[in-house]
Curated annotation (Swiss-Prot):
Protein name: Chondroitin sulfate synthase mig-22
Subcellular location: Golgi apparatus, Golgi stack membrane
Catalyzed reaction equations: 3-O-(beta-D-GlcA-(1->3)-beta-D-GalNAc-(1->4)-beta-D-GlcA-(1->3)-beta-D-Gal-(1->3)-beta-D-Gal-(1->4)-beta-D-Xyl)-L-seryl-[protein] + UDP-N-acetyl-alpha-D-galactosamine = 3-O-(beta-D-GalNAc-(1->4)-beta-D-GlcA-(1->3)-beta-D-GalNAc-(1->4)-beta-D-GlcA-(1->3)-beta-D-Gal-(1->3)-beta-D-Gal-(1->4)-beta-D-Xyl)-L-seryl-[protein] + UDP + H(+); 3-O-{beta-D-GlcA-(1->3)-[beta-D-GalNAc-(1->4)-beta-D-GlcA-(1->3)](n)-beta-D-GalNAc-(1->4)-beta-D-GlcA-(1->3)-beta-D-Gal-(1->3)-beta-D-Gal-(1->4)-beta-D-Xyl}-L-seryl-[protein] + UDP-N-acetyl-alpha-D-galactosamine = 3-O-{[beta-D-GalNAc-(1->4)-beta-D-GlcA-(1->3)](n+1)-beta-D-GalNAc-(1->4)-beta-D-GlcA-(1->3)-beta-D-Gal-(1->3)-beta-D-Gal-(1->4)-beta-D-Xyl}-L-seryl-[protein] + UDP + H(+); 3-O-(beta-D-GalNAc-(1->4)-beta-D-GlcA-(1->3)-beta-D-Gal-(1->3)-beta-D-Gal-(1->4)-beta-D-Xyl)-L-seryl-[protein] + UDP-alpha-D-glucuronate = 3-O-(beta-D-GlcA-(1->3)-beta-D-GalNAc-(1->4)-beta-D-GlcA-(1->3)-beta-D-Gal-(1->3)-beta-D-Gal-(1->4)-beta-D-Xyl)-L-seryl-[protein] + UDP + H(+); 3-O-{[beta-D-GalNAc-(1->4)-beta-D-GlcA-(1->3)](n)-beta-D-GalNAc-(1->4)-beta-D-GlcA-(1->3)-beta-D-Gal-(1->3)-beta-D-Gal-(1->4)-beta-D-Xyl}-L-seryl-[protein] + UDP-alpha-D-glucuronate = 3-O-{beta-D-GlcA-(1->3)-[beta-D-GalNAc-(1->4)-beta-D-GlcA-(1->3)](n)-beta-D-GalNAc-(1->4)-beta-D-GlcA-(1->3)-beta-D-Gal-(1->3)-beta-D-Gal-(1->4)-beta-D-Xyl}-L-seryl-[protein] + UDP + H(+)
Membrane topology: Single-pass type II membrane protein
Gene field: mig-22
Carbohydrate attachment residues: N123, N172, N268
Organism of this sequence: Caenorhabditis elegans
Length: 804
């Protein structure tokens, strides 16, 4: 009470003193003060006009006012947004598609009047190149083949003309999907798609125009039997005024004439065969009634340049005419493309030479391709692979040579043929002998480059030509002077990257997915490694952290395991669960009863995963671990993020430990220094002969003396349950395998991710391969992995060969 009173006294005194000072310096009448202030302000503002609204007081007359507003900065704050239910601002109506809002459209649409079976041929030839082809047919003329087309719109005339129905259907189709150009034609007219696409790429579409062949009566309308090309503004006018055609239609006019008149009346445009320097070319070689069919006359027509430039060829009689014309125009277009390529290559060579002169650098080959990439350091230098016609030498740590087969053989054979053609075209007198050497390298900017050394045989004449009266002596001397020599030719071949494709974006992945770790224990020799794995996992929980993700540790026990071993594993699982309680770790022992022998790891893994998916469901990640695995905590996070449902499975490349006796890991570093080399070698050989179980005395680290990353080891992988069930259907229930990688290969929807995983290590163990596996590649893969994981080559050499 006393302390609060003392504080309040000071506050009250300060308030009273401030009020007294305010009353002393300022007037107590607010109206007078306001009037004086306003008078002073208006006096300053009206100095130029010398008119004062209010008379300033004596105090205000003595004050001097300065204008400081020129340095002011005006800040305009946005008004607060009103609630959603009180927003009276009209909202902008957005279009559904960005293409509609931006005004982007497809280039051309072809509308074909289907009257016979020729419509199928026109649809097949034109539809491969034009963005949109649509057929319109009278329902009474549609047969079974025509009815199967998805781009067909049938109609019923009901006493009306064809144009009224077709234009009505076109109006409905172009309300939302518009085009720059519209082609109207009959199915008896062949349209050259290559000429059509070049025409629309050359002309501007925003001018109303109707292109085609004008009628002979001079009316100015375009003929429908030779086709007509309408720009987007012309088609827009046709759609808006299409109903006016009915007022001018005559009953005596046929459908084609009525259609032509309707287009002329509705668009109010005259037919133009020439527009912006582009001509609408029509070939009338088969116009007469007695003219042969088009497919019989192509050999005569192809000599005419006008035929090669033709856009429309009317009066087709059969499907053979359309197919023959299309095949011919495809050949013409390919020849034109070849000429353009040759012209472009010459231009690129000229530009490359010009750039080389300006920069002072060497000319890259082939022209227009960037030179070889310069490596940033010596560790990233591109490695050339050496090959012959039977073998391929790769840059691999443990395998130097492989047989040339499969796609590699096809690649080398094609390159050798191309190199031979180049050499033999320049020197036809050479006789090919063999491929001597070959090298290849991949550059991501250039493609695949090859250097091919070819051996040829050449016959030369060593005797100079002299005049001799005896012809027989000349022939004998000439034969003696002939000599075969060996000629070497080196050819550089480049296989450029023809096309690139962006991969589909991978789905979004989160790291909070539940994981079920499955450890199959198929025999007694797997019990001790599995218990060591559980003990290492328990040590990871010595410093537990709060974990929101659930991890389930499951040991799959097979019938061959003794009961005391099962009891020991169960006790270890209980201890693991107790130590990792804060990490949301669950444990379980799963009895498995396979139908076949589990000698192969793949068979045991399949049986364990089958029962695990049945018990725990298919909507979680299953991480299969070998009993001999040694994993770190980070490995589970990578398994979560690299396993994607319905998209990707994760097969890590583990670090496999070498035999500790051969690699010298049974001795500590101090013992290795104190023990002579020969004595250590003899001791290692003795332990190997006696079959002593190796015991590592050093920490297993990722180093080349301790082991290797085995790319042929597929014993550990992560997969979603639903993806495993889908892949499991490829295998029979009684099939024996060494691994399960082949189940996920060859699937379009599932990707296989392989990555080197330093946090996954496989302890050394005597690996057994099931020789009764149904897959020969599976057996070969297991045997190769078993041999290469014994030790490094230098370690084996030091052990087997005594250094003198």
């Amino acid at each position: 009470m006393v302390g609060g009173g003392r504080t309040g006294i000071h506050l009250l005194l300060g308030f009273l003193i401030g009020a007294a000072l305010a009353l002393f310096f300022f007037s107590s009448t607010p109206s007078i003060d306001l009037t004086s202030s306003l008078a002073a302000f208006t006096s300053c503002q009206n100095q130029e006009t010398e008119t004062n609204v209010l008379e300033p007081s004596a105090l205000e007359k003595g004050r001097v006012y300065k204008d400081l507003s020129e340095h002011w900065i005006v800040h305009q704050d946005d008004m607060p947004a009103p609630p959603h239910n009180q927003d009276a601002t009209p909202k902008v109506t957005r279009t559904r598609f960005a293409a509609t809002e931006l005004g982007t459209r497809e280039r051309v649409m072809a509308a074909v009047m289907a009257e016979s079976a020729l419509a199928l041929s026109i649809n097949a030839t034109l539809g491969r190149h034009v963005p949109r082809v649509h057929l319109f047919a009278d329902s009474s003329r549609i047969d079974n083949d025509l009815a199967q087309l998805t781009n067909l719109s049938p109609y019923k005339l009901n006493g009306q003309k064809t144009h009224s129905m077709v234009l009505g259907l076109l109006f409905n189709m172009t309300v939302h999907n518009n085009y720059d150009w519209f082609l109207l034609a009959k199915d008896s007219t062949y349209i050259n798609p290559f000429v059509l696409l070049r025409m629309i790429d050359t002309m501007n579409w925003n001018e109303p125009v109707v292109m085609g062949e004008a009628a002979e009566d001079g009316s100015g309308r375009c003929r429908l039997d030779t086709g007509m090309l309408l720009s987007q503004p012309a088609m827009h006018a046709l759609m808006n005024n299409r109903n006016a055609c009915n007022n001018f239609a005559l009953a005596a006019d046929d459908d084609q004439l009525a259609f032509e008149k309707c287009i002329q009346i509705a668009t109010n445009l005259t037919c133009k065969p020439l527009h912006q320097g582009v001509r609408y070319e029509v070939w009338r070689g088969a116009e007469r009634a007695d003219s042969p069919a088009a497919h019989d006359s192509i050999e005569d027509w192809k000599h005419s340049p006008a035929f090669k430039r033709a856009l429309a060829v009317p009066r087709l009689l059969s499907d053979a005419d359309a197919s023959a014309l299309h095949d011919y125009f495809v050949r013409v277009e390919m020849q034109r493309a070849d000429r353009e390529i040759i012209k472009m290559e010459a231009e690129l060579s000229r530009l490359a030479e010009q750039e080389a002169r300006e920069t002072g650098e060497a000319i890259s080959w082939p022209p227009a391709l960037p030179p070889y990439a310069k490596p940033p350091n010596r560790y990233q230098v591109s490695t050339w692979e050496y090959f012959t016609m039977t073998e391929l030498f790769r840059s691999e740590p443990n395998q130097n040579v492989r047989r040339l087969e499969g796609k590699d053989f096809d690649d080398v054979a094609e390159v050798v043929v191309a190199a031979r053609q180049q050499v033999e075209s320049e020197e036809p007198e050479l006789e090919f002998v063999q491929l001597r050497n070959g090298y290849r390298v991949f550059d991501p900017r250039r493609g695949m480059d090859y250097m091919v050394d070819l051996t040829y045989r050449k016959t030369v004449n060593e005797m100079p030509e002299v005049d001799n009266r005896f012809e027989s002596d000349n022939e004998a001397a000439h034969e003696e002077s002939l000599k075969e020599i060996v000629v070497e030719r080196r050819v550089h071949v480049s296989r450029m990257i023809a096309s690139t494709q962006l991969m589909n974006q991978a789905p979004y992945v989160k790291e909070d997915t539940d994981v079920t770790v499955v450890i199959p224990v198929a025999s007694e020799k797997d019990v001790l490694p599995a218990r060591k794995l559980l003990a290492r996992q328990a040590r990871l929980c010595l410093f537990p952290t709060e974990e929101a993700r659930k991890t389930r540790m499951v040991v799959a026990v097979f019938p061959l395991i003794e009961s005391r071993s099962v009891t020991a594993i169960t006790n270890d699982m209980e201890e693991l669960k107790r130590r990792c309680k804060r990490s949301l770790l669950e444990t379980d022992v799963l009895p498995v009863h396979p139908a076949v022998s589990t000698e192969g790891k793949g068979t045991a893994a399949a049986a364990a995963l089958d029962d695990a998916v049945d018990r725990y469901g298919a909507n979680t990640i299953y991480l299969l671990l070998s009993p001999h695995a040694d994993v770190q905590k980070e490995f589970f996070d990578r398994a979560r993020i690299n396993t994607i449902k319905h998209y990707q499975v994760f097969f890590p490349v583990p670090f496999v430990e070498y035999h500790p006796t051969i690699s010298g890991m049974e001795m500590t570093e101090k013992e290795e220094k104190e023990t002579p080399t020969e004595q250590a070698r003899e001791a290692a050989l003795s332990r190997l002969r006696d079959g002593v179980e190796p015991k590592r005395k050093r920490t297993l680290i990722v180093q080349k003396e301790h082991g290797r990353f085995d790319s042929q080891d597929f014993s550990c992988f992560a997969v979603y349950g639903v993806d495993y069930v889908t892949a499991r259907a490829k295998f029979g229930q009684n099939e024996r395998r060494n691994d399960l990688i082949s189940a996920f290969l060859g699937q379009d929807s599932i990707h296989v991710l392989r990555a080197v995983e330093p946090t996954l290590r496989i302890r050394y163990h005597k690996r057994s391969c099931d020789m009764e596996s149904i897959d020969t590649e599976d057996i070969a893969r297991c045997l190769d992995s078993k041999k290469e994981n014994v030790a490094a080559k230098d370690q084996l050499a030091k052990l087997l060969f005594h250094e003198k």
